[in-house]
Amino acid sequence: MGFKLQMSWMPSLLSQKRRNGPPLGLRNLGNTCYLNSVLQCLTFTPPLANFCLTHKHSSHCDTYVDGERKRDCPFCIVEKRIARSLSVDLTTDAPNKISSCLKIFAEHFKLGRQEDAHEFLRYVIDACHNTSLRLKKLRYNGNEPFNGNSVVKEIFGGALQSQVKCLSCGAESNKADEIMDISLEILQSSSVKESLQKFFQSEILDGNNKYRCESCEKLVTARKQMSILQAPNILVIQLKRFGGIFGGKIDKAISFGEILVLSNFMSKASKDPQPEYKLFGIIVHSGFSPESGHYYAYVKDSLGRWYCCNDSFVSLSTLQEVLSEKAYILFFSRSNQRPASAKTLVTSNGTTSHEVNGCETSNPQKFIGPLNGFNMKPQAEQSFQKGNLASSKPHKFIRPKPRAEQAPLEDNLLSSKVEKAPLRPHAKVSISVNLGAKRVSPVNGRLSFHQDENIAPKANKENSVSVLPTKVNSGTERKFGTENGGNGVKENGSAPGSSNHKVALHPHERSNGSSNGGDHHKDNLHPCGSNGSQNGTAHPETERNGVSTTQSKGLCSSTKEDPCILLRKDESSRNELEAIKESLKKDALSHLRSCGWYDKVLISMHAKKRLRTEQSGGEDGSDLKRRLIEDVKSSLKSQIPEELKADLVNRIWEISKKKYS
């Protein structure tokens, strides 16, 4: 059954009262202002409203068998709520059904408790998207190639491109991340335009943060540039006003306009160079934390009139009043049509999308890779070669040269130093954290892509693109061998022990061979002092916390001839080491954000905090923070991606070998 996305309002679908009168007010059922505000903005999202008013989803849904409902469907609930709000001849209504089914969208949500509006929005979008994919999968029944397109993705989905260019040889490496919204840092900005400029500002990778160029085969100075590869039909922007789990709120005014033009931020590879948007909704938060205060929304109806929707109280407003508010979430709709050529991005499996919500579309839209929930910003990193989206390579995440048989350091390597992240979203890998909280993808969930955000116990969500970034196996094999050509390790786009959608890592190559051809010593791999045997006989090694004792000795020992900066005590070395730590921290946290780990931590910590607050009452803030960290530390550490641990080991290894004056 065909369906073409209709971006403008279809007045014939609206009831007379809803077409000429104000929006339907939604009664507050007990701290449900966040839910009411999100529902009002979704209701007045034209393409989604048109889709729901024609019952495109429920008419194909499998939740009813022989007229009896088998289970509650999140998309059916949303569709029915939106259609009712645009059809009934009432002044106010109560969103009873969706309020009573909160756990369908997020297990940790609780009726009667204040929740974050942006978090709820992402869960709703994610649930509807995944429901569409489930129905689509049933319809295909494994007989045809399956892609990750849905009506939700066609409405809210876009893609960001991250390009790293070697400043020595000019070689470029491109990577794409799908998004469902964008989260912007506002602490150092005064306007949405300024925040966007900072988000897409180029970055020079130099010093301790150099990039390993495959063409040059060495560490080089490079330029990293973020840009928009595919602009979404509906652009959702979150202004990151909340500073963290234990932080406050950024309550300053951030200016924004009715018109938003993204041409300055578009990728050169995009077929859509001039996307223009017009504001149609905002959500405002008044108060000092996401767990308290009050949410209300402004929406523009089908006749272009602005209304303030404050739960059941709806009043006529003006554009000037809207632009004067301290907005938390902005909703923009494209005012110029997306070119047909911009809808021809190649999917991860190279197939063309012909369906939306399981229905064929007259204008198929292709995206890069399937969405796996949001962990959007994202979730995983998708990669592609410039000019060839189907066969692609990710950015090289590893800085040093490969060395085989180097066991990665375990969790204790990251136990204390990973404190700040560069939400993204972005965009913004699905990493399950068993803390009773489901993370959206995107966003990022992230779907959420995140850039330079802090990961302190609730992070300020800077430059995060709620992505639904998803990692895609490029389909290319990367071969790594030892320096003498022996014992090569072959990885199909993934690190050992990781899923096939993670970035391939260079295992360590053996640096010293034995004289008799016996086993190489792990001890001989350590540059700061050699503890290995010379006859090729391997020594037994004990392990503590996942790190071999001989390995630890090798990494931390030093000699007079080749002093290791990790052990030097002079002030100059200490300062240089601190700079190295900051570089490692920045890269590690950027990776944690892009893979969705940061968002998992954020949502899990929020849920734990609320639960403990309810159970203990007025617990001291410092005690609450300590207990929360104790509760989640071990489980979250175990979820840190293995490729990140291996990369940090490699880089620390290279640092320990380097001679410093």
UniProtKB/Swiss-Prot annotation:
Domain USP, first and last residues per copy: 24-335
Pfam families membership: UCH
Polar residues composition-biased segments: 462-475, 545-558
Entry EC number(s): 3.4.19.12
Protein's UniProt keywords contain Hydrolase: yes
Region span, Disordered: 387-406, 449-558
Family per similarity comment: Belongs to the peptidase C19 family.
Protein name (database record): Ubiquitin carboxyl-terminal hydrolase 25
Protein encoded by which gene: UBP25
